[in-house]
């Protein structure tokens, strides 16, 4: 009889623990979105914890940007974003510094519209010539686009001609404006380009020109379920999660 009572007590404790965090709200930015959209259902299946995902860039002036969402009082248990932007939130006292975990690195890639010829970008000079001969170029308003506009063009000494035919695209995936024919070339983090229909992935830009973006995650200081949030972060560092991240175009980092 006592074993039945003990089993009932343990079951009650486990159910109570799960009930304390049956739903987590996660804000994630573009580069990790494809991976997280695969991982969240797996985590729910394994733990019973429902995950609500809110999307937004790591920075920028759009209302959907994660810092802006948090600033106006939107709730999140976990934020997944560009590491430097996460550090800004940590320094501002918005995210618990002890909760930060490193997840993956992301590199910049290029797409063209499906059916279009793929220009050469296998060397710095080929890449430079491809840019100069392009009719139009689009890139994101997040970390990769900021780098392209402020650093890459200048490094290649083509800032003048490129700025005249380039556009920073807010809110939506860059691939979508290449797919509809609005722009000839599109640049964004690889993980954000691969899921877009109607484009062909040409490849990563030359490694000598890369800007590697680190993705990290943390728990806001006002999270409603901080303990459950940390368990999710542990899962995101697991081998299972790293394998999914790799498939979606990211380069996982070891915990």
How should each PLM-predicted stretch be described?
Residues 22-64, 71-75, 84-92, 96-97, ...:
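Exported/periplasmic ABC-transporter solute-binding proteins
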Residues 5-17:
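Bacterial N-terminal signal peptides
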Residues 80:
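Phosphate-/polyanion-interacting regions in eukaryotic proteins
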Residues 1-2:
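N-terminal secretory signal peptides that target proteins for export/translocation
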